[in-house]
Amino acid sequence: MRGMVSFAVWALFAALLSQQLFASVASVRFEDAKTYYLSPPSGSHGTPPSHTPPSSNCGSPPYDPSPSTPSHPSPPSHTPTPSTPSHTPTPHTPSHTPTPHTPPCNCGSPPSHPSTPSHPSTPSHPTPSHPPSGGYYSSPPPRTPVVVTPPSPIVDPGTPIIGGSPPTPIIDPGTPGTPFIPAPFPPITGTCDYWRNHPTLIWGLLGWWGTVGGAFGTVSIPSSIPGFDPHMNLLQALSNTRSDPIGALYREGTASWLNSMVNHKFPFTTPQVRDHFVAGLSSNKAATKQAHTFKLANEGRLKPRV
């Protein structure tokens, strides 16, 4: 019986001792939790330690050793309530910033996180405006295409050639025309009056007025025919006003000579007219007869030559 009492006392003592030890341990853990999880007092903003992501993460997100700060940590529900101390311990800020150690290369696996309280409330994480620039490689922005405008072609019109001799114009002589005749020739014959009134026909036929000596040859005895000069022109011979047989022979003989040149059907040829004219100068009787014959031919009353 005495042994039973002794065992109960020891058991009670052990229970009290273990409860005291557990309360001390819980108080220490609570102070530690307050040191790491309590929000900093208002007005004081400490600069968080800068963490340079190591190059050995192999593309994994950067490792942040500092735990997230919960908004209101609550003690575990299954932990017995410790005795409330008489005063609230003031958490002290560690004088030095813990240096995080570089975890080994995870090669794509997510980094390990420190243990958190068994049932903390989910802290709120603000969404960063800029993603971390650690091991992540964002896609580069699309490049703006460069449009190259092709150069405008330069057309050289060339230098005009100025100078030089102008080309020689080609003159087509064409078919030579008929000699100009101011008035129509008579159809068959023309009287002495007709030729006297159309002096341009004589000029168009001979190119000049002509002479009696050139038409009928040199007169053998010019002095025997008073008033007539062998150098007189044909228009003067047609216009003489003598009323004797020699004057009539000059008028009609000159008209016959012109008709024989323009009309191939005239009864006498040009040589025949010349011969008959010279023969008529032999005497007044011969001159009268030949002048009458030339007059009939000039008026078209003789048979035309075939």
Swiss-Prot record:
Signal peptide region: 1-23
Name this polypeptide is given: Protodermal factor 1
Tissue: Confined to the shoot apical meristem (SAM) at the layer L1 in vegetative, infloresence and floral meristems, as well as in protoderm of organ primordia, including during embryogenesis. Also present in the tip of emerging lateral root primordia.
Keyword Phosphoprotein set for record: no
Gene that specifies this protein: PDF1
Family matches, as PANTHER family: PROTODERMAL FACTOR 1
Record's compositionally biased regions (Low complexity): 40-56, 84-99
Organism of provenance: Arabidopsis thaliana (Mouse-ear cress)
GO cellular component: extracellular region
Keyword Signal applies: yes
Function noted in UniProt: May be involved in the regulation of meristem growth.
Transmembrane segments: none
Location of the region described as Disordered in the Swiss-Prot/TrEMBL record: 40-156
Biased composition (Pro residues): 62-83, 139-154
Key words of the record: Signal
